[in-house]
Design a protein with these regions (language model features):
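C-terminal "cap" of GNAT-fold acetyltransferases
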Residues: 1-8, 147-163
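Conserved active-site alpha-helix within GNAT-family acetyltransferase domains
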Residues: 107, 125, 133-153
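Conserved N-terminal entry element of GNAT/NAT acetyltransferase domains
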Residues: 1-18, 33-35
């Protein structure tokens, strides 16, 4: 079962939408987040479409890749390129289902997405690609370093009760 990578610009194609939504839900549940206590945010098809509209309305170009194995979505990644400030591009989510990890799918997705990004005329003035990775997520930190990301800062996330 060799995964196939599909890349596109903009909203998720209808034929891939259900798989994209399932993976987004799994990511919020499965990715190491240290001691944060926030609960998973379900991402159904409607939530995915709302998020896409919001990002596009804010001026972002969505650069996306999805890995499929036997027609099942097994991984995805997303880059956000701002039409208003294209100098710093944001590498957003990258996620691979646990059963498919360790096969280079995350790397293949990120590289396919970077190629797609570089094909956009809007990326001509882009200088940096920025991402955030939780320190307990050692595999993603390792992948990001392997493809050229360098640590620029450490972000500390604090949470507390309201009220």
């Amino acid at each position: 079962m060799t995964p196939v990578s599909l890349s596109w610009i903009g909203p998720c194609p209808d034929s891939l939408l259900e798989g994209w939504a399932v993976l987004r839900s799994r990511m919020s549940d499965d990715v190491p987040m240290g001691d944060l206590t926030r609960t998973a945010v379900p991402a159904d098809v409607e939530a995915v479409r709302r998020n896409e509209r919001r990002m596009i309305d804010q001026g972002y170009i969505l650069v996306r890749s999805l890995a499929r194995a036997d027609r099942d979505a097994v991984g995805y990644t997303e880059i956000l390129l701002s039409r208003h400030d294209p100098e710093i591009v944001h590498q957003d989510d990258t996620f691979v289902e646990e059963r498919m990890r360790g096969r280079g799918i995350g790397r293949a997705l990120k590289m396919a997405n970077l190629r797609r990004l570089m094909s956009l005329p809007e990326s001509d003035s882009s200088r940096f690609l920025q991402t955030y990775t939780a320190l307990p997520n050692a595999p993603m930190l390792s992948l990001n370093r392997a493809i050229g990301f360098e640590e620029a800062d450490i972000l500390t996330v604090l949470e507390g009760p309201l009220g």
